[in-house]
Amino acid sequence: MNYSIILPTLNENGHIIQLIKSIKKNFHNKKNNYEIIVVDDNSTDGTISTLKKFKKKNKKVKIFVRNNKKRNLAESLNLGISKAEYENLIWLDADFQHPPEYIKEIFKYSKEYDVVIFSRFLKKSIRYFDKNIKTKEANEDQSIFFNKLCKFIFYKDITDYTSGYICIKKNKIKNIKLKGYYGEYFLSLLIYCKKNNLSILELPFKEKLRKTGSSKTIGGSKVRYVVVCFNYIISIIKNILIKI
């Protein structure tokens, strides 16, 4: 089968090449063809120049830079999806919190299922949580709260509405554009998949510690946390109305 791996990046110079090499290891047996699409949100740490040097000897890697002043994960993914040549789309965080070695698990199920998601909330899943990092703690609390709320309101058979680690058929989402913040866009995407009767499989994985770079997720001050929480709630209400 053929796979387009989309990597949204922002100041990932410290490890982006290591990540790409790790992804490539999943395809060493040549049974599956692939391309790696890097969509950079105008990094300032040398990520772009590092990628361009690496690309000269790696034809499987494609680089696209968003020079928009407003950095946005969903828009980066939309660009990556539009540039993808293959039917099976995989995207994951570029900071190693989504371990690339799990891509091999996707190979087992992507033919049978329209959507394969790695969940942090299944029995065999392991989540990284550093209690010494306050912003991380806030994000963890938010993630737990919103996933429980979404599970209660929407579909109980989905455990992780804000995962961000997914494989999905390109033709199944050709009529939509991803919108919103990190968790908000993923929530809306999953609601869309359920409403359109796409077959969905969740798999457990072991979340890891972010290596280096700048997070595209929430983070930041308590004010920022409250604002994003509010946006999430609005998004949930909108999806309730759509579901009705």
Set out the residue ranges of the language-model regions:
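Acceptor/aglycone-binding surface of glycosyltransferases and processive sugar-polymer synthases
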Residues: 68-83, 88, 100-179, 183, ...
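Short, well-formed alpha-helical segments that are part of the catalytic scaffolds
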Residues: 12-26
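Acidic helix N-cap motif at the loop->helix transition within catalytic regions
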Residues: 14-17, 45-53
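Conserved short acidic donor-positioning loop in nucleotide-sugar-dependent glycosyltransferases
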Residues: 41-42, 68-71, 94
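Conserved donor nucleotide-binding strand/loop of the catalytic core
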Residues: 34, 48-83
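Hydrophobic helical membrane-anchoring modules
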Residues: 1-3, 153-156, 178-244
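A conserved acidic beta->alpha catalytic loop
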Residues: 40-49, 96
